[in-house]
Amino acid sequence: KTVCEKGPAAGSAFSFPHTVYNAAGGYLSIFTGLKGFCATIANGTQAGLQSVICACDELRSGAVDAVLAAGTDENSENITEVYSHLPLPGHVVGEGCVTMLLEDAAAAQARGARIYAEILGYAGTHQAARYGAEPAQEQVDRTLAEALQDAGLTAVDRLFTAQEMKARTGDARAASAALALAEACRAVSSGECRTAAALATGWTGSVSCVIVGWKEA
């Protein structure tokens, strides 16, 4: 804003680090002393879930024993204004931040940590399409199947959670995916009705799925 009003000479190079996507990861490292692998994923509504997948890949490789995986979304007046004009009936833009410590099971047990859940498997797919295009139902079905296969599970007694953009086509796709598992799933839920949908950019045609096994408290 200062540069726009007063020109380039009024800008400061020290302001730049606050404007880039990977600033949050840098601050975490500075304030906590964390070192090692660090990545920033900017992929709209898939970013938080894909950060979990990325962290799991690092854990599976054996390169690390623990990883912080985070997803954050902060709204602005501009974002709220833009999405208020999109054809998304009933859609409410949400914001917030979640950070999870993902750790190798053996390492967590060795330090006596309380284990809330176990990530059993995951998968993601992508299709080349124009900007704003909805992924085909085939991609959704494939993602679910691959995630279950990676986890070594079937849909029996699984809880299926659907997250979509509240666009009619998106809701229809989520419903279709749920119906595909309806005979086997114990329950189907969608959290957006309570939390609204947090997002950073538009749709990218990506679909992600993480199979989580919750531990008894």
Where are these regions (language model features)?
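Predominant activation on well-ordered alpha-helical scaffold segments within soluble catalytic domains
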Residues: G25-S29, L49-C56, R60, V98-A106, ...
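Fold-independent oxyanion-binding glycine-rich loops
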Residues: T19, A24, F31-T32, A70-D73, ...
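Condensing-enzyme catalytic core mediating Claisen C-C bond formation in acyl metabolism
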Residues: E81-L153, T195, W203-A217
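Glycine-centered short loops/turns at secondary-structure junctions
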Residues: G62-A63, G112
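Acyl-CoA/ACP chain-elongation machinery
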Residues: A63-H85, P89, G124-P135, T161-R194, ...
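Conserved active-site "lid/cap" helical segment
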Residues: Q139-L159, M165-T169, V188
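Conserved catalytic cysteine-centered active-site region
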Residues: T2-I53, L88-V92, A162-A180
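Short acidic/polar capping segments at secondary-structure boundaries
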Residues: L34, G44-G48, C56-D57, V64, ...
